[in-house]
Amino acid sequence: MKKIYPIFIVFALIVSCTSRQPQAVKPPLMGWSSWNAYMVDISDSIIIHQADLIVKRGLKDAGYGNVNIDDGFFGYRDQRGYMIPHPQRFPGGSAQMRSISDHIHSLGLKAGIYSDAGDNTCGSSYNKDLNGIGAGLWMHDVQDADQYFNNWNFDFIKIDYCGGI
Protein backbone atom coordinates (compact mmCIF):
# COMPACT_ATOMS: atom_id res chain seq x y z
CA MET A 1 0.00 0.00 0.00
CA LYS A 2 2.89 2.35 0.79
CA LYS A 3 4.26 1.93 -2.76
CA ILE A 4 0.92 2.69 -4.44
CA TYR A 5 0.33 5.96 -2.57
CA PRO A 6 3.36 7.88 -4.04
CA ILE A 7 2.53 6.58 -7.51
CA PHE A 8 -1.06 7.79 -7.12
CA ILE A 9 0.15 11.26 -6.02
CA VAL A 10 2.50 11.57 -9.00
CA PHE A 11 -0.22 10.40 -11.39
CA ALA A 12 -2.75 12.88 -9.92
CA LEU A 13 -0.28 15.77 -10.24
CA ILE A 14 0.56 14.89 -13.84
CA VAL A 15 -3.10 14.66 -14.83
CA SER A 16 -4.08 17.87 -13.07
CA CYS A 17 -1.15 19.84 -14.50
CA THR A 18 -1.47 18.64 -18.07
CA SER A 19 -5.23 18.50 -18.53
CA ARG A 20 -6.02 22.12 -17.69
CA GLN A 21 -6.18 24.55 -20.53
CA PRO A 22 -6.13 28.26 -19.78
CA GLN A 23 -9.54 29.79 -20.32
CA ALA A 24 -10.35 33.36 -21.09
CA VAL A 25 -12.04 35.08 -18.20
CA LYS A 26 -15.42 36.50 -19.10
CA PRO A 27 -15.92 40.03 -17.85
CA PRO A 28 -18.91 40.72 -15.63
CA LEU A 29 -21.96 42.44 -17.03
CA MET A 30 -21.07 46.11 -17.16
CA GLY A 31 -23.04 49.21 -17.99
CA TRP A 32 -24.68 52.32 -16.65
CA SER A 33 -27.78 52.62 -14.49
CA SER A 34 -29.52 55.87 -13.69
CA TRP A 35 -30.12 55.19 -9.98
CA ASN A 36 -26.81 56.15 -8.33
CA ALA A 37 -26.49 59.46 -10.14
CA TYR A 38 -30.12 60.53 -10.46
CA MET A 39 -32.31 58.32 -8.25
CA VAL A 40 -35.88 59.14 -9.41
CA ASP A 41 -34.96 62.47 -11.04
CA ILE A 42 -34.48 61.03 -14.51
CA SER A 43 -35.78 61.99 -17.93
CA ASP A 44 -35.73 60.89 -21.52
CA SER A 45 -32.90 63.32 -22.35
CA ILE A 46 -30.71 62.10 -19.47
CA ILE A 47 -31.01 58.48 -20.61
CA ILE A 48 -30.26 59.30 -24.26
CA HIS A 49 -27.31 61.51 -23.28
CA GLN A 50 -25.77 58.86 -21.03
CA ALA A 51 -26.16 56.15 -23.68
CA ASP A 52 -24.46 58.40 -26.22
CA LEU A 53 -21.61 59.10 -23.77
CA ILE A 54 -20.95 55.39 -23.25
CA VAL A 55 -20.07 55.15 -26.94
CA LYS A 56 -18.43 58.57 -27.30
CA ARG A 57 -16.10 58.08 -24.32
CA GLY A 58 -15.05 54.58 -25.41
CA LEU A 59 -16.77 52.74 -22.58
CA LYS A 60 -18.60 50.47 -25.02
CA ASP A 61 -15.25 49.34 -26.42
CA ALA A 62 -14.10 48.65 -22.85
CA GLY A 63 -17.03 46.27 -22.34
CA TYR A 64 -19.77 48.51 -20.97
CA GLY A 65 -22.71 47.24 -22.96
CA ASN A 66 -25.83 47.97 -20.89
CA VAL A 67 -27.93 51.06 -20.22
CA ASN A 68 -30.54 50.71 -17.50
CA ILE A 69 -33.44 53.09 -16.92
CA ASP A 70 -33.87 52.70 -13.18
CA ASP A 71 -36.63 53.78 -10.81
CA GLY A 72 -38.37 57.05 -11.66
CA PHE A 73 -39.84 56.40 -15.10
CA PHE A 74 -43.18 55.35 -13.60
CA GLY A 75 -46.18 57.59 -14.00
CA TYR A 76 -49.15 55.45 -13.06
CA ARG A 77 -51.05 52.34 -14.07
CA ASP A 78 -54.04 52.80 -16.34
CA GLN A 79 -57.44 51.17 -15.73
CA ARG A 80 -56.21 47.92 -17.29
CA GLY A 81 -53.06 47.88 -15.13
CA TYR A 82 -50.59 48.91 -17.83
CA MET A 83 -47.70 51.13 -16.83
CA ILE A 84 -47.85 54.67 -18.19
CA PRO A 85 -44.49 56.52 -18.11
CA HIS A 86 -44.13 59.66 -16.00
CA PRO A 87 -45.74 62.46 -18.08
CA GLN A 88 -43.10 65.11 -17.26
CA ARG A 89 -40.00 62.90 -17.23
CA PHE A 90 -40.99 60.89 -20.32
CA PRO A 91 -43.60 63.06 -22.06
CA GLY A 92 -43.75 60.86 -25.16
CA GLY A 93 -45.34 58.04 -23.19
CA SER A 94 -45.09 54.42 -24.28
CA ALA A 95 -44.00 55.31 -27.81
CA GLN A 96 -41.10 57.27 -26.36
CA MET A 97 -40.00 54.33 -24.22
CA ARG A 98 -39.79 52.27 -27.40
CA SER A 99 -37.82 54.99 -29.19
CA ILE A 100 -35.38 55.23 -26.26
CA SER A 101 -34.71 51.49 -26.31
CA ASP A 102 -34.37 51.61 -30.11
CA HIS A 103 -31.82 54.43 -29.79
CA ILE A 104 -29.83 52.44 -27.21
CA HIS A 105 -29.88 49.43 -29.55
CA SER A 106 -28.74 51.59 -32.48
CA LEU A 107 -25.58 52.29 -30.45
CA GLY A 108 -24.93 48.56 -30.12
CA LEU A 109 -25.93 48.50 -26.45
CA LYS A 110 -28.54 46.55 -24.52
CA ALA A 111 -31.46 48.45 -23.01
CA GLY A 112 -32.71 47.68 -19.52
CA ILE A 113 -35.55 48.88 -17.38
CA TYR A 114 -36.33 48.75 -13.68
CA SER A 115 -39.03 47.24 -11.53
CA ASP A 116 -39.55 45.89 -8.05
CA ALA A 117 -40.69 42.40 -7.11
CA GLY A 118 -43.10 43.86 -4.59
CA ASP A 119 -46.00 46.24 -4.98
CA ASN A 120 -44.02 49.47 -4.59
CA THR A 121 -40.61 50.64 -5.79
CA CYS A 122 -37.46 51.72 -3.95
CA GLY A 123 -38.16 55.31 -4.97
CA SER A 124 -41.49 55.26 -3.20
CA SER A 125 -39.79 53.91 -0.09
CA TYR A 126 -36.62 56.02 0.00
CA ASN A 127 -37.46 59.11 -2.06
CA LYS A 128 -41.15 59.41 -1.22
CA ASP A 129 -41.93 59.20 -4.95
CA LEU A 130 -45.68 58.57 -4.94
CA ASN A 131 -45.54 57.36 -8.54
CA GLY A 132 -43.73 54.24 -7.35
CA ILE A 133 -46.66 53.13 -5.20
CA GLY A 134 -48.31 50.19 -6.95
CA ALA A 135 -45.74 50.29 -9.76
CA GLY A 136 -43.95 47.04 -8.88
CA LEU A 137 -44.30 43.66 -10.54
CA TRP A 138 -46.60 42.28 -7.81
CA MET A 139 -49.75 41.06 -9.58
CA HIS A 140 -48.49 42.61 -12.85
CA ASP A 141 -45.46 40.44 -13.64
CA VAL A 142 -46.71 38.87 -16.87
CA GLN A 143 -48.34 42.09 -18.04
CA ASP A 144 -45.22 44.17 -17.32
CA ALA A 145 -42.89 41.63 -18.94
CA ASP A 146 -45.02 41.75 -22.10
CA GLN A 147 -45.03 45.54 -22.10
CA TYR A 148 -41.33 46.00 -21.33
CA PHE A 149 -39.97 43.25 -23.60
CA ASN A 150 -42.46 43.11 -26.47
CA ASN A 151 -43.93 46.61 -26.69
CA TRP A 152 -41.05 48.73 -25.44
CA ASN A 153 -38.29 46.38 -26.74
CA PHE A 154 -36.12 46.27 -23.61
CA ASP A 155 -33.59 43.45 -23.21
CA PHE A 156 -33.63 42.99 -19.45
CA ILE A 157 -35.34 44.08 -16.25
CA LYS A 158 -33.38 45.03 -13.14
CA ILE A 159 -35.53 43.84 -10.24
CA ASP A 160 -35.18 45.19 -6.69
CA TYR A 161 -37.16 44.14 -3.65
CA CYS A 162 -37.68 47.34 -1.67
CA GLY A 163 -41.46 47.26 -1.88
CA GLY A 164 -42.03 43.72 -0.71
CA ILE A 165 -45.30 42.80 0.86
Can you name each region flagged by the protein language model?
Residues 1-2, 157:
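Generic cytosolic/nucleocytoplasmic N-terminal low-complexity/intrinsically disordered segments
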Residues 2-10:
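Sec-dependent signal peptide recognition
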Residues 15-16:
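C-terminal motif of bacterial Sec signal peptides marking the signal peptidase cleavage site
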Residues 20-36, 67:
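N-terminal hydrophobic targeting/anchoring segments and the immediately downstream early-domain regions
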Residues 50, 54-165:
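Aromatic-lined carbohydrate-binding/catalytic grooves of carbohydrate-active enzymes
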